[in-house]
């Protein structure tokens, strides 16, 4: 599995800010403050040629387009992306993999994401991060996320080796950031989303959602 992944350096090519802004305007209605915050992140990437040490946490009520923002950023970065749905991850082993001593052992979701992407530089879209601390199995999935977010390397129990994570960029969504532990919250720049008015929702449906459905 490790041999199937292209392990790249963390050097990041400059992003065209005009193209980035165009993508944001295509994908998102309004949200000027959010777009400006994303553009600031892009300027930082262009200045350092590395991904920021922090990820983005998009926090707001259901139906405000949090996931859409995450996908737009992944598109701007031109990186493969994978989704971690924390509401369905009940056991840390789902993330870390299981030891080879078990007959049903296999790599975890994180290692499988690297394998599917075929490279080490990718976006992890972590949906419902506020549900990460509600594990029902042997431990807390939130503790595993910390090792992924620290960019110091991630250990998969099945692979039995350290996986470089310097090329990982996490973008998380949450409804309630107060449910997220302080250590995890400190790894993100938080973007708060207001709820849309009924009139704005009508515009979004007619000018953004409906055309995309018809295009498919």
Q: Language-model features: where?
A:
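Walker A/P-loop
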Residues: 51-86, 115-116, 181-182
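Pre-Walker A (pre-P-loop) alpha-helix and adjacent loop at the N terminus of AAA/AAA+ ATPase modules
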Residues: 1-59, 110, 210-211
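Conserved catalytic/switch belt of AAA+ P-loop NTPases
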Residues: 125-164
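Conserved C-terminal "switch" segment of AAA+ ATPases
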Residues: 10, 118, 176-186, 190-216
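AAA+/P-loop NTPase substrate/partner-engagement loops
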Residues: 76-106, 113, 133, 200-201
